[in-house]
Amino acid sequence: MLDTDIFSYASKGTNQEVFRRLSLVSVGDVYISVIVNAEIEFGIMSSPKPERDRERSLILLQHITVLDFPREAVHDYGLIRSDLQRRGQLIGANDMLIAAHARYLGLTLVTNNIREFSRIPGLTLENWAE
C-alpha cells in the first residue's frame, strides 16, 4: 500500500527509485487507501497547476487499486491512536488511518515517512524513496 508521499513521487516522476520499484510490481499488487486518495485530491486542489496534477494522478491511478476503508479497521485505528497518545507520540490523523488500514489488511505500507510510521507496532514498512 502506497503512502501519499510515494504516490506523489511516482506521479511527478521526482524519484527514480520509486519509479523503478513500481515497475517491478505487478499492476494488481499496488494499492492506495481511500484516505491517500483524499490526500491526493487535496494536493491537486491546492496546487498552482491543478489540471496538470490531476492528469498525472489519473494516469498513475489507472494502474493502482484504491481500497475502501473497512469498518473493521476502526478497531486498529483506536488501538494505534490510544497507544501513540499514551506514549506522547501522536502522528497526523490521516497517517493513523492509513496505518490502521494497512495493518488491518496485512499490507506493507510503502512510505518515505519511516520515522513516524515506525512508532506503530505491527505495521510493516518499506521505503522505496531511498
Regions found by a protein language model. Give the residues of each.
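Generic structural signal for small/hydrophobic residues in well-ordered secondary structure
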Residues: 3-4, 18, 40, 77, ...
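Acidic, PIN/NYN-like endoribonuclease modules and their adjacent C-terminal/linker elements
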Residues: 99, 103-130
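Short catalytic/metal-binding and nucleic-acid-binding patches
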Residues: 32, 36, 43-48, 67, ...
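Short, well-structured N-terminal submotif of metal-dependent ribonuclease cores
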Residues: 1-32, 44-59, 86
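Active-site neighborhoods of divalent-metal-dependent phosphate/nucleic-acid chemistry enzymes
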Residues: 65-110
